[in-house]
Amino acid sequence: METTSANFTQNDSNVCTNLYNHRGWAQYFLPAMYSLICIVGLLGNVLALHVIWPNLKKINSTTLYSANLVVSDILFSLALPLRVVYYARGFDWPMGEGLCKAVALLFYINMYAGVNFMTCLSVDRFIAVVLPLRFSRFRKVQKVRYICGVVWVVVLMQTLPLLSMPMTNIEQSGHITCMEYPNFEKIDNLPVMLIGAVVLGFGIPVITILVCYTALCLKLRHLAKSNKLTEKSGRSSKAIGVICTVILVFVVCYSPYHVDLLQYMIKKLRYDPDCSELHKFQISLHITVCFMNLNSCLDPFIYFFACKGYKKKVLKLLKKQVSMSFSSVVRTSPEGSSKDVFGNDKIQMNSRSFQKERSSVLLNSLEQ
């Protein structure tokens, strides 16, 4: 039986009364973490957008996917202050059902958009380096715009149904919880739905990303072995290092939450977990969701170290700010022509061997 009061839903559950007994440490740890994620994520992604925006006319596939990822991260960061207030109040939401649904919508949009656009980026890099001729048409800007549009439509189809679900619940303690797992427990076939969401929203994308980047690493290792100049320059090693960093960030941020969710849903299909197990799951969810949200503030750092053009433009911007502060002129060398904001170095054809030219082209494609 359910009763409603002041736009909030109250479940008639007197079974579990200890689900938020960890609020003592959570109301300090979670606000601190989310405040850090909000500040770093917002500043980093706004800076990334500031670098990308003036160069939209020179945009290419990599930049376009990255721009969509940046927009998603910014929208998510703007909603985090409300979550900080919620956690600081000890899991108590004072802002109504409507705002709770809006914050939940932005949270899940960011999660699915982040996974999908990271997958698109991995496939884009795979095509650029491993299959540059056969599938190059899928890297044309016009087609990539359509792909981005389809991704957003799919993400909205995945998340908009949340607006029809109750997001808040009045606990026996009087606290009003928002976007907590127990608030969804009365949804029919919830374990099956969430297992399907984990497989489609995380399992398939992570396999795609691992396959694409593994193929990239193998290709780069082959290029380094067949071209001593490339191996000596260290460019292939740097590229492989960047790829490993991207994979590590993705796996560390997204895997704990989805693995945690998957194991508990499988457990629910077998039997009904008791209050102790549900409480442990609640604690693990709060921690793993926090890790997953770290991804939004780590993306700008990946752009900085992975993309030469982005790094150069950020450093130039910082030098400009320093020069203005100290009323001094810092002269920098003019930038060469660039295909896009992430700096696709112009390849100069010369009389060197074909293998060296091919290695340079593929490595430059990876650094876009």
Swiss-Prot record:
One Pfam family cited in the UniProt record for this chain: 7tm_1
Extracellular compartment spans: 1-27, 92-101, 165-189, 263-282
GO biological process, one term: osteoclast differentiation
Chain ranges passing through the membrane: 28-53, 74-91, 102-123, 146-164, 190-212, 239-262, 283-307
Residue positions the entry lists as glycosylated: N7, N11
Cystine crosslinks: C100-C178
Protein name in the entry: G-protein coupled receptor 183-A
Organism this protein belongs to: Danio rerio
Lineage: Eukaryota, Metazoa, Chordata, Craniata, Vertebrata
Gene name for this UniProt entry: gpr183a
